[in-house]
């Protein structure tokens, strides 16, 4: 049986405006110089959980998590207008550009 890595806290958080009225909550954990990995939570509605930070070795990976439109700490909460697959892809690209990441592993 595999176990998760130890609990960690984010070293940076961001609030990223995307298509109005949505603002995404984004956080970074682990090694700022590590291999970038993006965690995608299920949805709509749930958001990521703190234990989701623990899937990857924080010494090796730059772990990026964000709450999708209407979920978790993103605002407005439970607002699903404009929550489409194409919008999600656009939001993921906006997060990647915000953080200056060229390529990353996508998990979720």
PLM regions and their residue ranges:
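A generic structural signal for ordered secondary structure
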Residues: 13, 29, 38, 92-96
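N-terminal cap/lid segment of alpha/beta-hydrolase-fold proteins
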Residues: 2-23, 28
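Conserved acidic catalytic loop of the alpha/beta-hydrolase fold
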Residues: 86-104
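Short glycine-enriched, charge-decorated loop/helix-capping segments at active-site entrances
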Residues: 77-83
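Conserved HGGG/HGGXW glycine-rich cap/lid loop of the alpha/beta-hydrolase fold
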Residues: 18-76
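Conserved phosphate-coordination/catalytic loops
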Residues: 20, 83-86
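Short beta-strand immediately N-terminal to the catalytic nucleophile in serine-hydrolase-like folds
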Residues: 106-108
């Amino acid at each position: 049986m595999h176990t998760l890595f130890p609990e960690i806290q984010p070293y940076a958080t961001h609030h990223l405006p995307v298509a109005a009225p949505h603002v995404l909550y984004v956080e970074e954990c682990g090694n700022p110089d590590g291999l970038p990995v993006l965690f995608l939570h299920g949805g709509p509605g749930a958001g990521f959980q703190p234990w989701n930070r623990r899937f990857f070795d924080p010494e090796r990976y730059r772990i990026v998590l964000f709450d999708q439109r209407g979920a978790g700490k993103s605002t407005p909460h439970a607002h699903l207008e404009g929550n489409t697959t194409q919008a999600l892809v656009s939001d993921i690209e906006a997060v990647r550009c915000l953080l200056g990441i060229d390529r990353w592993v996508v998990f979720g």
